[in-house]
């Protein structure tokens, strides 16, 4: 990324960051990185393949080359730079799904309500759309699929670090609570052939999970259950993973979810919260901006270690360990 020591230029680039975000979103939505996977192409050829206006697509591509996502060669040709490779659908840790989701109109509009959130403490998404994210998506299958694809992308990226940091071999049955379409559970079951798994999420989300588990070759060890974690979750397992779930909720609902899990788990069981942990002042940009994302969209928050302890206590759980898993922490909790 180009840097400049002039603070006026640096702040201007930060202010205009939304333009880069939207440009990446458009390129991801058009599948530009996949079209460049085999090598360089001209802007005209890419426009023909994407059904876009060639001179305008060229303007988008050269802007992306200026921030080192693409590289522009002679004759309006473009190839992927290392950052752009991350936008291919087929790379490990692909961010294509996340980029397609994050700039989509409904989500984008909700971020326009950040000022409202800061003034009132209220959820911007609800303010802008008149519905919470979950009911909004439940009635819009395309947007729901876009979100699930984004979550799958993030889950895949987190899986390797989680498996390296956490010994899943000690468990008999793992329930992935709010596990989306099953990317994380599939990775855990693949790494541990002796393990049984249960994927639990909203019925319309897990509807797509059977085929996913089949493709991953773990369907004989993965049970799929639809429901709401405010009512009940599958009983009797010795590990309950919740990745990026409690950060969607405020403390009242967070305690409700954890209490449901606590009620269901085996006496010797544990809960593994896979979440960003808020760092001390001036550190940890990713968690602190993710916290704003939680404020704006689902209405939740990222938490410090102490805030996780305060959330777990009323649910009858206590922190046994906090394990570093790269961008995330694993907060391992057991019954009191
Ligand atoms: C931020 S996503 C994380 C998904 C997945 N754990 C991951 O890491 O990719 C939160 C998940 O919670 C699920 N969820 C939301 N409300 C739910 C409810 N009441 N009961 C069960 N799952 C719910 C959503 O469908 C979504 O899959």
What are these language model-derived features?
Residues 2, 8-42, 48-49, 54-172:
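Conserved Class I S-adenosyl-L-methionine-dependent methyltransferase catalytic core
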Residues 69, 193, 317:
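Short phosphate-binding/catalytic loops that engage adenosine nucleotides
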Residues 77-79, 278, 325-327:
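Conserved beta-strand edge residues that scaffold enzyme active sites
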Residues 93-283, 329-330, 336:
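Conserved adenosyl
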Residues 270-315, 319-321:
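C-terminal alpha-helical "lid/dimerization" subdomain adjacent to the S-adenosyl-L-methionine
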Residues 317-336:
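Core SAM-dependent methyltransferase catalytic element
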């Amino acid at each position: 990324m180009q840097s400049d020591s002039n603070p006026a230029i640096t702040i201007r680039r930060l202010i205009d960051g939304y333009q880069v975000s939207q440009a990446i979103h458009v390129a991801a939505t058009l599948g530009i990185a996949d079209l460049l996977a085999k090598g360089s192409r001209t802007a005209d050829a890419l426009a023909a393949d994407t059904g876009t206006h060639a001179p305008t697509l060229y303007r988008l591509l050269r802007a992306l080359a200026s921030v080192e996502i693409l590289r522009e060669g002679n004759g309006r040709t473009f190839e992927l730079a290392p950052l752009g490779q991350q936008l291919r659908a087929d790379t490990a840790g692909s961010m294509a799904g996340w980029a397609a989701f994050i700039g989509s109109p409904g989500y984008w509009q909700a971020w326009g309500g950040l000022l409202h959130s800061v003034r009132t403490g209220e959820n911007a998404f609800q303010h802008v759309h008149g519905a919470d994210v979950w009911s909004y998506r439940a009635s819009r299958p395309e947007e729901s699929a876009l979100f699930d694809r984004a979550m799958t992308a993030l889950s895949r990226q987190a899986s390797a670090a989680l498996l390296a940091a956490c010994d899943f071999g000690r468990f008999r049955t793992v329930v992935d609570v709010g596990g989306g379409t099953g990317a994380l559970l599939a990775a855990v079951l693949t790494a541990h052939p002796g393990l049984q798994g249960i994927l639990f999420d909203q019925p319309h989300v897990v509807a797509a999970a059977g085929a996913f588990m089949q493709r991953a070759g773990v369907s004989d060890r993965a049970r799929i259950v639809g429901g709401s974690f405010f009512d009940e979750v599958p009983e009797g397992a010795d590990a309950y993973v919740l990745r990026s779930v409690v950060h969607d909720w405020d403390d009242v609902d967070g305690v409700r979810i954890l209490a449901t899990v606590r009620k269901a788990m085996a006496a010797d069981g544990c809960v593994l919260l896979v979440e960003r942990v808020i760092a001390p002042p001036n550190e940890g940009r990713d968690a602190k901006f993710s916290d704003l994302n939680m404020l704006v969209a689902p209405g939740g928050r990222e938490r410090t270690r102490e805030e996780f302890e305060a959330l777990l206590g009323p649910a009858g759980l206590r922190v046994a360990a906090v394990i570093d898993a790269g961008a995330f922490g694993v907060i391992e909790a057991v019954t009191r």
